């Protein structure tokens, strides 16, 4: 059964709509030269093949885009040029009136096209050639073509000054026009003078009535000029003399009012486009049902052609109109239903209802060209539509959604495919779907899989600008891909690196396996909406991974004396340099790499693409796990999904030709083999198979999963030792489908005493913001457990957490709404003289946790030093009262913009920090954002009250007192042992706070008890007793920020096994816990925490501080730390283990 779900959409859309013609500011000189010198019709020859026919060339006509905005009926004009040519320049011939054969008629069309190409531009030259083109005016195309139509077709006498007004928009009035580009409204001022053009509807409202007929929007065969879809349309366009449907003061159309305007037509068949042409309110007027249905068919085809064009070219041409060529009809169309059925049959009624067809192939030839072809296709494919029945339309839809009850709002249906397409390509609309009504059995079910996974019935997710372009400095976080390369770097550039080929195994959290934090559908939708953001980072990532840049950064400093492990040095040489690396491997597996000897002039850099670094990392991971001696063994490698994968050449150079490398891909280029994985017969098996095949062709979660599984089955057949399989979308449904596939295939291999060892990893070099995971599959002689469904659910919850890994890069230097100019973190690099050095260094040490400095030249004496580092929000918050700091910052410094190409002399890599510290910093910063929203958005934060920071330690919460430069709350730090000196304009009280004092301070101001008071109770019973006391006795003057430890029984094994959590067995048994190597303290039970939170929320306004991947990444940036992937993946556990709350009175 093929389930063709139809979702109902309640129109109109909401959101701003872009006028596609705003870019058509055409100077008068260019316009006149174009219409005078360029032909109206372009004639081409095309060879078409049909079954049973020879390859005979066909004549194809296209309308020149410069003439496409005219109101002429080109179809009729090709039959009889006199319809558009003035009578005094057109000479009628006998051949145009006598009855002709088919061939004669075809030839006459071509002759008439030549007449029009010659005569009409010639007439325009005679009439307007004298215009002074040096005045620099602009042309109003709408007005100019409307006037020309009025004169030629309606034989109206149009004064030349009217044309001049349309061709020379330079007056003061026209300055408004040029700014708003509302050329329709401007032209109507002149057209209203022709009574013959005026149409009045039943409400007395007046419109200009202009034709839209006989369009040649697509290439058409001359022989089929009458029958091609879209070439015999006949309708009128009604343009209101005054546009009353714009949002006042904005110039934006109010689409709700436009739809309501349809009701002004009492007896006519009137429709409206979703996105009005020329960005001006107008209506389509049909004289009979036949023309209305033909127009609808034309729009179905036009929409799908546009979709294919966008999909094939990955372009942005008129992107904002994709999916919106369909029209909505006036409510009175209901009474014409029977006329539709009588003239076109029931299927066309449903066509009108559902609006779009799920065509099967990307080949535009498969789209019906003529109405006859369309009818055959439609009748055959949807012959069972009649089973759905006319009665279903009347009875299935709830009353509140029936047209007669919706009033001016229209109920529009679309197939699931088109619905998915609209959601994917437009972020400006608000789609509301309410119910699904259609499911029917298909007689032929052989093409179901094709429909689900076909590349053309969907919209690709990559490379689509889904919304307005965003500058990097408008984004809010930083990706782990780009700044996690190294832990630190000194001025001599001796570096300790994270292994570039390292991968991060996702933690399996039992506690998070109960439910999905984010459903697959929403996860996929959020990912698609973030495409515009990800595209901004593509160039940046390419720059960062440029082999020349990486050579200067990692190889050149280690040529003389290698300071990094030899295995990693070999990786950098393999990736960066196009030559055979020299190395030796001892019998015990010890590697020694010979330094490069070629000069810079002769050295060639490797050719790479966007996936090369990632895939080479996967190959080196194979060497890391199976042993370095695999390099000198004759292994075989297969790349699937490769276009021309450069990593294949890298591996050949690395193994000195011992490894055989094959590359297969649907879009492959020589020397790769071009083949579809589903059709190719892979006769051989390979030691290492790396699949990077595209899986973006499915619109739905189910389609994506089906495609992924079909690819995986092929891969399993052809690998011997290791399979690296890309999972493009880390969705729960997809992972479960993969698990089922492995169970099924594993049963076959079990008889051969072979088993799968499964591992799901996340490469730190995937594309920024991707949902990409990798399945690592080994064939072993030992049986291994596959991931359980709960473990897969935990993987999905860990990966991307709540925001689908939409972690984006920001240039650290631009304030956003809740940031301060002075608190804005950035990377700094300042050159100073030796005399200035100590003072400037002191300044920057007040802004950064770590400052590096040194000379750029290796000389005995230097007069200039460079200071560089990353600012830290906590230190700035502490010292911001010292205005001398900001005066010092006025030095002529240079910001290192990370989106630029790195200078190897000054390349600064942000240092890392302990994972738990990163999470605590992020939790404080998230609380700070909530406080700022209370202040700026709701004005409910009393900024006159003092903040009492209990257990202030290193005053890490001090910056939370800063709302903006002029609003800094009084701050008092209270701790029994603090190391901070009192010179920093902070009030410090060295004392301990007990219960009585805590609740007294709560009645005086804001109280912060973050990671302090409630984390000092020895047992669970004591802590739970204290929290209950808090509920019964807390009296708040301001807000309270608090945190404590919480444990879930199923969470304990995960915590014990996690790399950076160190707890003893004794603490676990006593329900105690602490991060690091501190003694454990009392925790509350998870269920107790939920009950306590419910009680507190009834009495107070409680904000739970929950971290997402973006929160953690953004906090790292603001604190001057490198992003740590382990911290991001551990976030769901951290939110449960260390809950944090911001409490205030309701």
From Swiss-Prot:
Origin species: Fiji disease virus (isolate Sugarcane)
Protein name per its UniProtKB record: Uncharacterized protein VP4
Taxonomic superkingdom: Viruses
Pfam families hit by this protein: Reov_VP3_MTase1 (PF20831)
């Amino acid at each position: 059964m093929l389930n063709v779900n139809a979702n109902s959409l309640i129109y109109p859309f909401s959101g701003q709509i872009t006028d596609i013609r705003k870019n058509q500011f055409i100077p008068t000189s260019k316009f006149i030269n174009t219409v005078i010198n360029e032909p109206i019709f372009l004639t081409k020859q095309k060879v078409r093949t049909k079954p049973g026919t020879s390859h005979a060339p066909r004549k194809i006509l296209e309308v020149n885009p410069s003439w496409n905005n005219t109101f002429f009926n080109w179809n009729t004009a090709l039959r009889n040029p006199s319809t558009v040519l003035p009578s005094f320049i057109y000479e009628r011939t006998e051949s145009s009136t006598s009855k002709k054969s088919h061939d004669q008629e075809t030839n006459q069309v071509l002759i008439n096209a030549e007449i029009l190409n010659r005569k009409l531009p010639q007439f325009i030259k005679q009439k307007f050639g004298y215009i002074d083109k040096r005045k620099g005016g602009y042309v109003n195309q709408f007005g100019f073509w409307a006037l020309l139509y009025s004169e030629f077709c309606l034989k109206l006498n149009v004064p030349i000054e009217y044309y001049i007004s349309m061709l020379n928009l330079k007056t003061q009035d026209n300055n408004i026009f040029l700014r708003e580009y509302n050329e329709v409204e401007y032209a109507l001022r002149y057209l209203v003078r022709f009574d013959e053009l005026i149409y009045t509807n039943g409400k007395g409202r007046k419109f200009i009535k202009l034709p839209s007929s006989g369009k040649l929007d697509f290439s058409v065969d001359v022989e089929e000029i009458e029958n091609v879809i879209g070439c015999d349309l006949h309708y009128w366009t009604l343009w209101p003399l005054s546009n009353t449907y714009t949002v006042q003061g904005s110039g934006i159309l109010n689409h709700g009012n436009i739809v309501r305007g349809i009701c002004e037509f009492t007896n006519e068949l009137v429709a409206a486009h979703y996105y009005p042409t020329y960005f001006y309110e107008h209506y389509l007027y049909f004289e009979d049902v036949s023309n209305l249905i033909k127009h609808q068919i034309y729009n179905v085809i036009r929409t799908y052609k546009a979709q294919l064009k966008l999909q094939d070219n990955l372009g942005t041409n008129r992107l904002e109109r994709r999916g919106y060529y369909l029209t909505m009809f006036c409510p009175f169309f209901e009474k014409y239903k029977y006329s539709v059925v009588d003239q076109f049959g029931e299927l066309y009624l449903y066509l009108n209802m559902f609006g779009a067809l799920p065509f099967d192939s990307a080949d535009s030839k498969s789209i019906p060209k003529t109405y006859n072809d369309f009818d055959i296709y439609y009748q055959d494919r949807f012959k069972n539509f009649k089973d759905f029945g006319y009665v279903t339309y009347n009875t299935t839809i709830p009353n509140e959604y029936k047209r007669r009850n919706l009033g001016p709002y229209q109920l529009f249906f679309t197939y699931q495919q088109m619905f998915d397409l609209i959601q994917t390509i437009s972020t400006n609309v608000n789609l509301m779907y309410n119910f699904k009504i259609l499911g029917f059995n298909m007689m032929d079910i052989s093409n179901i899989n094709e429909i689900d996974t076909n590349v053309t019935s969907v919209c690709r997710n990559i490379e689509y600008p889904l919304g307005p372009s965003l500058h990097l400095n408008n984004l809010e976080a930083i990706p782990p891909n780009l700044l996690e390369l190294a832990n630190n770097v000194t001025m001599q550039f001796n570096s300790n690196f994270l292994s570039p080929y390292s991968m991060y195994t996702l933690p399996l959290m039992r506690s998070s396996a109960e439910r999905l934090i984010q459903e697959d559908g929403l996860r996929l939708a959020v990912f698609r909406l973030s495409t515009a953001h990800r595209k901004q980072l593509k160039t940046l990532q390419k720059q960062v991974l440029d082999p020349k840049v990486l050579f200067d950064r990692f190889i050149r400093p280690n040529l003389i004396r290698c300071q990094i492990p030899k295995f990693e040095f070999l990786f950098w040489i393999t990736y960066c340099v196009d030559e055979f690396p020299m190395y030796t491997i001892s019998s015990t597996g010890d590697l020694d790499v010979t330094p490069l000897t070629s000069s810079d002039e002769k050295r060639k850099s490797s050719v790479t693409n966007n996936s090369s670094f990632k895939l080479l990392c996967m190959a080196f991971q194979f060497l890391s796990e199976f042993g370095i001696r695999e390099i000198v063994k004759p292994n075989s490698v297969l790349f699937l999904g490769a276009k021309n994968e450069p990593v294949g050449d890298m591996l050949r150079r690395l193994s000195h030709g011992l490894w055989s490398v094959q590359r297969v891909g649907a879009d492959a280029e020589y020397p790769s083999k071009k083949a579809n994985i589903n059709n190719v017969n892979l006769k051989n098996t390979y030691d290492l198979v790396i699949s990077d095949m595209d899986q973006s062709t499915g619109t739905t979660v189910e389609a994506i999963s089906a495609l992924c599984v079909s690819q995986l089955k092929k891969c399993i057949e052809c690998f011997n030792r290791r399979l690296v399989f890309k999972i493009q979308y880390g969705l729960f449904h997809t992972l479960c489908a993969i698990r089922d596939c492995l169970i099924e295939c594993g049963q076959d291999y079990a008889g051969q005493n072979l088993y799968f060892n499964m591992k799901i990893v996340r490469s730190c070099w995937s594309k920024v913001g991707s949902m990409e995971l990798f399945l690592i599959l080994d064939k072993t002689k030992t049986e291994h457990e596959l991931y359980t469904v709960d473990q897969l659910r935990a993987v999905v919850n860990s990966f991307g957490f709540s925001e689908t890994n939409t972690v984006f890069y920001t240039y650290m230097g631009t304030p956003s709404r809740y940031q301060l100019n002075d608190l804005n973190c950035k990377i700094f690099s300042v050159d100073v003289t030796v005399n200035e050095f100590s003072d400037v260094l002191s300044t920057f040490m007040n802004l950064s946790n770590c400052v590096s400095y040194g000379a750029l030249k290796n000389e005995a004496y230097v007069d200039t030093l460079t200071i560089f580092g990353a600012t830290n929000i906590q230190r700035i918050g502490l010292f911001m009262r010292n205005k001398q700091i900001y005066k010092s910052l006025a030095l002529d410094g240079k910001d290192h913009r990370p989106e630029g190409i790195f200078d190897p002399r000054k390349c600064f890599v942000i240092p890392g920090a302990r994972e738990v510290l990163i999470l605590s910093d992020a939790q404080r910063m998230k609380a700070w954002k909530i406080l700022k929203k209370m202040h700026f958005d709701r004005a409910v934060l009393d900024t006159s009250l003092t903040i009492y920071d209990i257990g202030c330690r290193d005053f890490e919460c001090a910056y939370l007192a800063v709302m903006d430069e002029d609003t800094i709350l009084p701050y008092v730090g209270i701790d029994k042992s603090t190391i901070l000196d009192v010179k920093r304009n902070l009030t410090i009280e060295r004392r301990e706070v007990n219960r009585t004092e805590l609740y007294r301070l709560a009645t005086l101001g804001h109280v912060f008890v973050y990671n302090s008071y409630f984390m000092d109770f020895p047992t669970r019973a004591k802590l739970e007793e204290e929290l209950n006391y808090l509920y019964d006795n807390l009296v708040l003057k301001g807000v309270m920020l608090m945190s404590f430890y919480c444990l879930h029984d199923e969470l304990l094994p995960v915590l014990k096994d996690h790399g950076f959590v160190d707890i003893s067995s004794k603490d676990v048994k006593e329900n105690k816990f602490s991060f690091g190597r501190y003694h454990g303290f009392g925790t509350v039970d998870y269920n107790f925490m939920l009950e306590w939170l419910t009680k507190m929320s009834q009495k107070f306004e409680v904000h739970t501080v929950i971290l997402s991947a973006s929160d953690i990444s953004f906090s790292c940036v603001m604190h001057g730390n490198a992003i740590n992937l382990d911290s991001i993946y551990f976030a769901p556990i951290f939110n449960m283990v260390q809950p944090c709350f911001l409490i205030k009175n309701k």
